Amino acid sequence: ARIIQLYSKLTIIQTTLKKKITAIEENDWTLLVKMPAFSVLAFALSEWRQQGSRLLSDKEEALLANLRVDGFNGWSAHYDTLVSFIKIPFEEADGTLNELSAGQAMNRMYADPDPSVRRKIFVEWEKAWGYLAPAFADTLNHLQGFRLADFEAHQDEDFLVEPLRYNRIKRETLDTMWQAISANKQPFLSFLDRKAALMGKDRLAWYDVDAPVSLGSFQSKTFSFDEAVDYIIEHFASFGPKLADFSLDAVKNRWVEAENRSGKRPGGYCEDYPESKESRIFMTFTGSASDMSTLAHELGHAFHSHVMRDLPDLNTRYAMNVAETASTFAETIISAATVREASSDEEKISLLN
């Protein structure tokens, strides 16, 4: 909460600066951004100048920033709290009854080779999330309600105006991307049909979409955390020593929180800290090849921040559409290596899945 409050204060200061930049005459601005002290920041400052033209009064922008602490950010934190209380009961084969966190349950539901296990977890997963459905619905509605009120205050008639600006793309670009996806989705649909056939089903259930495919005597491999790290470092080194050395240091310095324990939300996450020039990674590692890919993915995020560590802060800000490039590339290094080293067609099919 303290960090969010500090960020709110920073936003208010930045808003004032953006408006002052916008007020500078065009000729003076052209001369200013050519000065050595500002030329390196010309792109970021020019972007701020454009943003300043759509801002409200200082008082109104300050009010929005302060309301965001217990409004937009508050509801987001509320969602995280709700997820931390999710418990998925599951009876193991030996009769032991465990309570899985949302993160543990999701990993097992997607990665367990036994379809009966996946189905049992899915049923309990639906019950657990369904029990809190009204609270989640309220959370999502209030998050979106705050966002729409913000857009209306700034006279953004289309809800995509702000996301497009943030991601630095045009509406035509987004539309073209979706058109390309729609026009080329058939191979993906054919893949899902083929996967269902290989699993002996007419169609895939939700918990089968990401499930492993085990053909013949092949069973999906599992890895300890150390084995996954060793594999990742080895194949990162094939791309370049800087990526490998950085990733090894990140693990040795305990930047990765991957413990398989209760109370954790699903998925992986990486956060960078510009003051210390370090990153921290959050995930739940349960030993699957998918978990190894997630670890590689998050290390890719951390390396992205690392290579920009000496740039001015304003030049290190990028949106999600750029953020996923380094991480996806790092993940692909590992995925390609596992497929390349597969010892049988059955293993290769499992990995390609």
Predicted regions and their residues:
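Catalytic zinc-binding patch centered on the HExxH motif and its immediate surroundings
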Residues: F218-F223, V256-E278
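Long, amphipathic alpha-helical stalk/connector segments used for oligomerization, subunit docking
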Residues: A336-N353
